[in-house]
């Protein structure tokens, strides 16, 4: 994965360095670039990535805030679309999901 895998790579590192399972029992996929301040940036081809994630069994997809309009066209694919602006918000959203809450959505 190139820069569009930045969000998920960052979350994987956080998951390994912290206690517990960041995503609980949920199959979480997502995409987005990460800048040095932790801002999640938009990517191209999000609908293709969403289709691949859904076909792989994902039930949650982390969406860069700037890609939400395009991602909404895929709502019928059965995944919860979680809107993220930065890495901290992505971590918070996963904690909300694992506790049964509803994080910000697209």
Model-identified regions with their sequence ranges:
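Peripheral, non-AAA+ core regions of ATP-driven protein-machinery
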Residues: 1-106
């Amino acid at each position: 994965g190139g820069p569009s895998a930045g969000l998920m790579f960052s979350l994987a590192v956080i998951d390994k360095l912290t206690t517990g399972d960041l995503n609980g029992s949920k199959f979480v996929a997502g995409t987005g670039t990460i800048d040095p301040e932790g801002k999640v940036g938009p990517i191209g081809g999000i609908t293709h990535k969403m289709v691949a994630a859904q076909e792989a069994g994902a039930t949650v997809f982390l969406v860069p805030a700037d890609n939400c309009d395009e991602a909404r066209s895929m709502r019928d694919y059965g995944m919860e679309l979680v809107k993220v602006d930065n890495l901290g918000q992505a971590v918070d959203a996963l904690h909300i999901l694992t506790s049964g809450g509803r994080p910000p959505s697209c």
